[in-house]
Amino acid sequence: MKIGVIGAGKIGKTIATYLASEGFEVKIADIENRDIPNFVELDASDKTALTEFVKSVDIIVSATLFHLNKGIADVCAEVGTAYFDLTEDTEVSEHIRKLDTKTFMMPQSGLAPGAVNIIASDLIRKFDTVNEVKMRVGALPKYPSNAMAYYLTWST
């Protein structure tokens, strides 16, 4: 199975490295040329180039800037390539929900929402009744380096 990861920042590289270690054939794409294995230079806002990349794989994992996800999802739906993203952006998720496609589309599959929802669901199943569940996700570093004392992730 061939998996394309769009976005070669910290998260995208980590996803690609993990998938490759599990035996998947992985291509990783970004607009900035990176010296990493199986790298493809790609401007994800260029529909022609994006379509060519999407057609070359079975699954796309979008780990790029959230505002590019609508276009990436549209191309995946048109081409028939399964799509995952890590966005928390509800506008992107609503756009994907409205796509007329039989292609597997899975927005919001990152940490929160995503993994935290799976954890909550698993915990809920262990009880007879549940009145309320509150899950929180944060990134509090051991050695804060900014005024917010919070770990800045993604494109910060």
Predicted segments with their positions:
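N-terminal Rossmann-fold NAD(P) dinucleotide-binding loop
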Residues: G12-K13
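Rossmann-like dinucleotide-binding core of oxidoreductases
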Residues: T103-T156
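NAD(P)-binding Rossmann-fold cofactor-contacting core
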Residues: F24-P37
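Rossmann-fold NAD(P)-binding glycine/threonine-rich loop
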Residues: L86-M106
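Conserved Rossmann-fold cofactor-binding substructure of NAD(P)-dependent oxidoreductases
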Residues: A44-S56
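Glycine-rich Rossmann-fold phosphate-binding loop(s) that bind the pyrophosphate
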Residues: A8-G9
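Beta-loop-alpha module in the N-terminal Rossmann-like domain of NAD(P)-dependent dehydrogenases
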Residues: I59-V75, T90-E91
